[in-house]
Design a protein with these regions (language model features):
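Flexible loop and strand-edge segments within Gram-negative outer membrane beta-barrel domains
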Residues: 52, 74-75, 79-126, 130, ...
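Hydrophobic alpha-helical membrane segments
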Residues: 44-49
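Short, solvent-exposed beta-strand edge segments and adjacent coil->beta transition regions
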Residues: 7-9, 60, 110, 122
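Short gly/pro/ser/thr-enriched loop/turn and capping motifs at secondary-structure boundaries
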Residues: 39-43
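Transmembrane beta-barrel wall of Gram-negative outer-membrane proteins
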Residues: 15-38, 51-89, 115-139, 143
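A beta-strand signature from Gram-negative outer-membrane beta-barrel systems
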Residues: 1-11
């Protein structure tokens, strides 16, 4: 059961990590709610071992609309749209490991970037008829669509060193590459 407001109501929230907005409205046999949220974790990700420019962003919108022309019939719609975007431009990483007497250093310098996008749309329309207080029949039409894209080309050059001496234990390079795409659509109709 979703919240149905009795009158106009609204709220706003904001922080360094994002913002949100909610609006609800009702008049006689009609009600609707809408919500929007935006969030970014960009400022929290600066403490990770891999240094670079992190830019994750999340945006979503939800709605619930209800209309009841009389006590027996109701028409309801619920919907959601979301877009999550993750961009990453790595620059370097350094990790120290080992024992107190035998500390090693692993350093990596990067070229390239990662760009990911996840977009989702969902909606359901419901037409319901109550025959009695205990008998209700509903026709539900729903649709879901998603589009996902993960793409990156990141090359890293690495060095493994003894930290107590100038001895170099190893050097190397590697390449990570991906082009992952997913498009999915689903529709359903049920009683």
């Amino acid at each position: 059961t979703y919240k149905k407001p009795k009158k106009f109501e609204a709220s706003v929230s904001a922080s360094l990590l994002g913002a949100g907005l909610y609006v609800g409205y009702a008049k006689k046999n009609f009600s609707m709610t809408h919500g929007v949220r935006y969030k970014t974790n960009q400022y929290m990700l600066g403490s990770l071992e891999t240094k670079g420019e992190y830019s994750p962003r999340f945006l979503d919108y939800q709605t619930y609309i209800s209309w009841s022309p009389n006590k027996r019939w109701s028409l309801d719609f619920i919907g959601n749209i979301s877009q999550n975007q993750y961009d990453f431009l790595p620059t370097n990483r350094q990790t120290n490991f080992g024992t107190m007497q035998d500390v090693k250093s692993f350093r990596v310098y990067f070229d390239g970037k990662e760009e990911d996008l996840f977009r989702t749309l969902f909606g359901t329309l419901s037409l319901s008829h109550s025959f009695t207080d205990r008998t209700k029949l509903s026709l539900l039409a729903s649709a879901f669509a998603t589009k996902e894209r993960e793409t990156y080309d990141i090359q890293g050059q690495y060095w493994l060193d003894e930290t107590n001496t100038t001895e170099q234990l190893g050097v190397g390079t590697y390449m990570e590459h991906a082009r992952n795409y997913l498009d999915a659509n689903m529709k359903s109709l049920k009683v």
